[in-house]
């Protein structure tokens, strides 16, 4: 038996993030809360979200259970709700029931065995920069009509995001005094597919800062928190494979 109650804003942001890389997802619910890990079909990007039970208005489960869902069906339910509402969620056999104010709706669950939960790779780097989300987004937006990739550079002086084509280029330069926190005693560079980053940054609306970690030609790790509930923040991790330059 699963009975949950969560803010529509939180559920929408979780769903928006997952929909940037997958069409189906499997949620795990246990005594600690709810979590989900998903990887896109090309194995380029991965998202991990951990929702502590304190983030729920109501949280009840008889034990560990899995809920597999079609993301578009979930989004269709969320569209019926006001952003200021909470949504009640109950697992009833092979269906998931939703209570949204005066509206009750149910959707069919998928077979959890058909969705593989990927293992999170051991990606670590001692080099990182904590950036304002607004600064990072501006750098990505400046590059979106120029190229399909963007190169990040981190040094003792700060962080740069550079993109170019045969006729155009863009560069965002953040000196270290505009960076919330950083650790780097050398110069590292790596390029990443811009499309994934733009979808990701568009989907997260409630976070103020992002922790970027990478090395030369190495996967990018972005750690963040969704801030709808300051006392019980939803922890997020976004991993992105590098774009190898010729």
UniProtKB/Swiss-Prot annotation:
It comes from Thermoplasma acidophilum (strain ATCC 25905 / DSM 1728 / JCM 9062 / NBRC 15155 / AMRC-C165). Signal peptide: none annotated. SUPFAM superfamilies: DNA clamp. This is DNA polymerase sliding clamp. The keyword DNA-binding applies. The gene is pcn. Keywords: DNA replication, DNA-binding. Transmembrane segments: none annotated. Sliding clamp subunit that acts as a moving platform for DNA processing. Responsible for tethering the catalytic subunit of DNA polymerase and other proteins to DNA during high-speed replication. One of its GO terms (biological process) is regulation of DNA replication. InterPro entries: DNA_clamp_sf, Pr_cel_nuc_antig, Pr_cel_nuc_antig_C, Pr_cel_nuc_antig_CS, Pr_cel_nuc_antig_N. Belongs to the PCNA family. GO terms for molecular function: DNA binding; DNA polymerase processivity factor activity. Homotrimer. The subunits circularize to form a toroid; DNA passes through its center. Replication factor C (RFC) is required to load the toroid on the DNA.
